[in-house]
Amino acid sequence: MMTKMMKTKSSPNANLFAALRAAFPADLDAIAVETENGLHYSWRDLDRASAMIANLLDGLKLEKGARVAVQVEKSVEAMLLYLATLRAGYVFLPLNTAYQSAEIEYFIGNAEPAVVVCTGRNAAWVRPIAEAAGTRHVFTLDDDRTGTLLDAAARCSDRHTVAIKKPDDLAAILYTSGTTGRSKGAMLTHRNLLSNAEVLKDYWGWTKGDVLIHALPIFHVHGLFVALHGALLNGSKILWFSKFDPKRIVAKLPEATVFMGVPTLYVRLLAESGLTREAVRNMRLFVAGSAPLLIETFNEWRERTG
């Protein structure tokens, strides 16, 4: 008598990085990120660099679900650290660069990260706080592509198998602004972040050929999740600005199709004489978020840009 063996259907990997990586274009040598200083990163660069940092994190023998707290200036390498943390299956915790010692002490004490990454200039006071809270690993990362994190990652392989995650596994923790008491950590799962990115990709009509101007900080939702995930999930080129420079951004508008910003950024762009209908001729989507946009600002923007 023969017994029919039933195959168990394996579940797909719910790791957000797996979805983002699957959206990379076929031509991995195409430019993925162009910085305001003329540096270019290909999609292959993003894949390899994130793999190296992920291998570094794995080599630390962290516990499952370990938190990686990051307070660094905006840079492509900081973005790669985020992707690497997802890729390796750990939990990313971005911290506002304006936070001082008392705030950092609270967040690190509350979140209990296994890894803390800070700027070189802040390491002297961040390291004692982290070590007192039980953090075993402290690295530095600066916006000139230097620091102990990149030094250590440079010795790691550029091949990495994406960690298997379930939809409801934690991907990131973002602390609230603390308007009703002490800041609280909002727990965001891989499912949360991917579903949000997919909905916005569809709603905003991301298409092949879209180019994003990324001028937002990456320590909060708008810059890290809404803008970045949208571009990566669409395989879109990113024009990267580490600092908001209205004149240089206006000069890049003809090369872009999508821009996301907070209302104050739109006010600053309106002060530039180069902001004309001709300058935005290729733009199809401007998004204002994170705070209310005054109707006066909206009307002036519409008048200037059409």
Can you describe what each PLM-predicted range is?
Residues 13, 28-29, 156-175, 182, ...:
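Conserved pre-ATP/AMP-binding loop-to-beta segment of ANL
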Residues 73, 118-125, 216, 244-245, ...:
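Adenylate-forming
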Residues 40-44, 171-195:
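Conserved AMP-binding A3 loop
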Residues 194-211, 219-258, 272-274:
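Conserved AMP-binding/adenylation subdomain of ANL enzymes
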